[in-house]
Amino acid sequence: MKKILIATKNQDKITEILDLLSDINMKLISFQDIDFNENIEETGRSFQENAVIKALTAGRKTKITTLAEDSGLEIDALGGRPGIYSARYKDGSDMDRCMKILCEMKNISKEKRTARFITIVAIYEPLTEKVVTFEGMSEGYITDKPLGKNGFGYDSIFYNFALKKTNGQAKLAEKNKVSHRSEAILKAKQFLIGL
């Protein structure tokens, strides 16, 4: 059975990806399964560059077909911040980062709070040395307070237009029907099936 390495140490992302790929006829493994402890530096200037860096680095070292992704939140009123720095926007917890965003946006009206989550999935195939990428996007806006306890990252402050509630108020199955990550992963899934 073909192996696919999911190149992330973020357990929440692994959970979402495993759920989305649960019916694929391949063995999905993570860094923990192969004792991969290297820290991959995200030195790219875009989600695509970072996803490709992660896929190439992990795939070349392990010689396993590798799926990596980079995601982030872009807020129009903040000039696209936090963007590629979403996970590193502020030291501390996910809630600390949410509160920083809410503080920065406290005087911004609802109609100017538009935002989107973007995911780029990169798949590296060691036999061909090629990388292919897939994009997913969710449109919405930033709420004025956290709503919901599900998900991770900025989910509690991102009102998802497709869900008609925050990602934090949605169950994983609901979120995985319309999220930026699910859109990109489902495109990648079709590619993987063809390998």
Model-identified regions with their sequence ranges:
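Anionic-ligand binding patches
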Residues: 2-5, 11-195
